[in-house]
Structure formats: structure tokens, C-alpha cells
Amino acid sequence: MNLAYDGSAFCGWQAQPNARTVQGCIEEAMRSLLREPSLSIVGCGRTDTAVNASYYVAHFDFDELDCADLRHRLNSILPKEISIFSIEAVKEDFHARFGARRREYRYYIHTAKDSFKRSYSHLYTYNLDIEAMNRAAGMLVGTHDFSCFEKLGADNKTSICTVFEAGWIEYEPEIPGEGKYYCFHISADRFLRNMVRAIVGTLLDLGRGKRPQESIPALLESHSRCAAGESVPGHALFLSKVDY
């Protein structure tokens, strides 16, 4: 199952009691349509409250069904914030989470007030040295312990991740406004909870001169969340690609 969702209306992907989640909404709809009260779906990863996905993969086990019809019926009853792109049969050993080899996130910022970007981009009004930010982002590439960017109290077995690429680009929005528009993209084999937002916050500090770019290697070695920058808001973050 390939889908997208606007995370602003949900408390993240993962189903949880007394909270509106993407997984919970989809499972409720599918259980009703397929008359399977115990049906569950497995997602390619967990996204936090307000975080979006422009491309997301999930799987579920079912013997036989009309995939096109199920997609149509799901889209007709799911909240407007969730769109199902496709449903197709896969091999029995396919696993949406453990089979994923590469995930990509994008984070958007704009430097001047923009009514059309406010819902999916972070307003950051400081002048930024993008070249310095890109040099620092390049220092994240490779296999490292990223615990300095991990949410405190997380229960991961390991904080080791391999980052394949990371960097900033300036882009022109469809409806131009004042200021500049930037997108940070990062791909890795896995991500820790809050990792991307903490990295972005740290690079923004660096871009406005609050920390030197040479501090990144020492920051990784510190394993201290307190040494990194503050996490940026979740509404401007998108899971954008998953490779298998």
C-alpha cells in the first residue's frame, strides 16, 4: 500500500489509545470494509505528531481481494488528510519496515512571512550561510552514532545510522513570495526518533553563526542531546521516499 498524509491532524503514524493516528484511522476503515476486526497494518516507520508523508509504504496480510476496489472504497471513507495511491499484491516475505533499505526526509523553511507556506514550511527569519550549512551537512554522511540528535528517553537498541546524503537547496515556490525558500534533504538506512528535526535545528544554528561548522564531528562524538541544537517544528517535515 502506497499512501500520503498530512500529519497536522494526527498524533503521528503509530496507533495508540485515545489518540488520532494515521495507522489507527486506516486500520479502522479497513476492518470495517473487509469485516476483519483483528486486521492490522505495518508501516515503513514511525512519524511523530504533525510530521507529514508525501510517500509512505505499509503492508497488511489478506488472502484475496480486489486491490483497485479496496483503494477506491478506502479513499471514499478515510479522512481528507490521508490519500491512498495504490494497493497491490506483493511477495509473502515483503515487510514494509524491515525491508526498507533507504528512507528520505525533506524539511522546508522560508525566511519571510508567507501565508501560503505557513502550514508546511518553517518560518526562520535569520540570514543563513547555506554554503557553511552544506559543508556541515556533508560531515553527517557516513556511519555514525547519532545519539546527540536522538530524543531523550528513546528506547532504540542502537543509535548507529548510515547517512547516504544530506544537504540544502534553495528553491522557487509555485507562488513566489518575499525572502528565500530552502529545503533540507537527508537519506539514511534508518532514522532515530526526532533525529531529522534536531539535525535541522543544529544546522540552522550553524547557518546563523551560533556554532562553527567544525563542531559537527565533536558533536557526534559527544553523544549528548544537550550539545545539539533545538528541534524544529514537525509541520515542515516530510517523509518523501522509501526504497526497498
Would you name each region that the model predicts?
Residues 1-244:
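Structured-RNA-binding interfaces characteristic of tRNA pseudouridine synthases
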